[in-house]
Design a protein with these regions (language model features):
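ABC ATP-binding cassette signature C-motif
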Residues: 1-170
């Protein structure tokens, strides 16, 4: 699938556009129509989908009860959660670790269109590399907001810039 990046200055409306596309914010006008079999999945900067009282493994397992413990642990290991790390509670995790948990959940979801808002924020270099590997293996389409030039250059198949004048493709 394609890896489309949306870039632009702070405050140009990139996150708002994503939220409009996902019907999380009311649009002023127009119609949003996804393809017949499109299932979007969203990663937001705040990781608002996490239950802070869960452990890492329970957070992912609750979202994927059909998976075995081994499958869950393998998915978590791909995002650098190994050994006793999987038993940490979400409330004790750093911002980067919470981001990795959200990304694991999203990658295991049924979504075939990933919409990622600043997924490399708060991630250290090994975590960024794990994310890059996971996205490279992902077969669906990905739309990403990012200011991370290295990440964009490594992953992007298309780049659009949002500005007050509109959208420009590069």
């Amino acid at each position: 699938g394609e890896r489309v990046f949306l870039i632009g200055g702070n405050g140009t409306g990139k996150t708002t556009l994503f939220k409009i596309l996902l019907d999380k914010v009311e649009k002023d006008s127009g119609i949003i129509h996804w393809g017949t079999n499109v299932i979007p999945g969203y990663y937001d900067q705040e990781q608002s989908d996490l239950n802070i009282s869960n452990t890492v493994i329970d957070e992912v397992w609750n979202a994927n009860p059909q998976m075995t413990q081994t499958e869950i642990r393998n998915a978590l290991a791909a995002f650098l959660f190994q050994g006793d790390d999987v038993f940490k509670t979400i409330s004790t995790l750093s911002g980067g670790e919470r981001g990795r948990v959200s990304l694991v959940k999203l990658m295991l979801s049924k979504a075939n269109l990933l919409i990622l808002d600043e997924p490399t924020n708060h991630l250290d270099i090994p975590s960024r590399e794990a994310l890059e590997a996971a996205l490279s293996d992902y077969e669906g389409t990905i739309i990403i907001i990012s200011h991370d030039r290295y990440f964009i250059n490594r992953i992007a198949t298309r780049i659009f810039e949002l500005s007050p004048d509109g959208i420009t493709e590069y």
